[in-house]
Amino acid sequence: VTYVAASPRSAGKAYKDAVSSRWLIGANIPEGVADLVVEDANDPSKALGKCKFVFSALEMGKDEIKALEKAYAQEGIPVVSNASANRWTEDVPMLIPEINFAHLDVIAEQKKHNGFENGFVAVKPNCSLQTYMMPLHALIQAGYPVKRMIVTTLQATSGAGYPGVPSFDMIDNIVPFIGGEEEKTEKECLKILGSVVDGKIQNAEYPIVSSTCTRVPVIDGHTACVSLEFDLPEDKKPSLEEIEKIWTSYTSVPQELNLPSAPKQPIVVRHEENRP
C-alpha cells in the first residue's frame, strides 16, 4: 500500500490518526501504512506516480461512485472496485478470475468508449456469490450444464459493515431478509457466466436462480446451501464421486500463472459433518 485517500474530512491526516477511533481489527495498523498521509479522494491526480492501481471501497451514491471511479480511470489509473455501482455497466468486467478471466477483453472497448489511455474500471461481485460460483463453474466446465439453482445464504454480520445489524436483531435470531441481496444473487451469476460479444458482456441464460439470503449471528464467513438441477438426462448426471474429483482437480488461469494471491487449490472439499 503506497497511497490512501478518503473524504476531505480525513485529508491531510496521517492514516493512523484518521482511523484511530475506527480501527477495529485485532492487529496493529501496519507500520508501512500508519504514517501515510491521507489524500482527498476527490482529486485523482494526487494518486499519479504513487500507485499502479487503486482499490475502491466508496460509501457514496451510485452515480457519485461511477463518476469518481471514472475520474481515476481517466487519469490513467486502473480501478478495482468493491462497490456495486459499476457491476451492471456493460463494458465493466465483474470478475472471479478463475471463472471469467476472458471478460478482461472488454477493457479494450471500455477504454475506447471512454477515452481512457491506461486506466480502466473492474469490479468484484457480491460477496456471498464468491462462496459457490467456483464449484458451480467447475461442474459446467466439466460438461455438466446446470438449468436451475436454489440458493440459501447464511451471511455473517460483518458483511453489513460496522456498526452493522443492531444486537437486538441478531442475538438469538436469524434475520431472514437482506435488502437487495437476493436480486444481486439471482442476476450477478448470469453476468459472471456470460460471454464477451462485440466488446460487451452478454449474460448467460442459465442457471435460473431462486435465492433466499439471511443474516446469521456469526462474525466472519458466509455459508451457502446450494441445490442444483442439471440440464441432463438422469443417466448422464455426475455421481458424487465424479463431482468431488471435478472440484478437487479444478484449476484455472490464476493458478497457471502462479499469481501470488491465487490459492493453489481453489476448491477444497471437506468431509467432516461439522464443516460446510
Residue ranges and their predicted role:
Residues 56, 224-232:
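Short, well-ordered beta-strand elements within core beta-sheets of diverse protein domains
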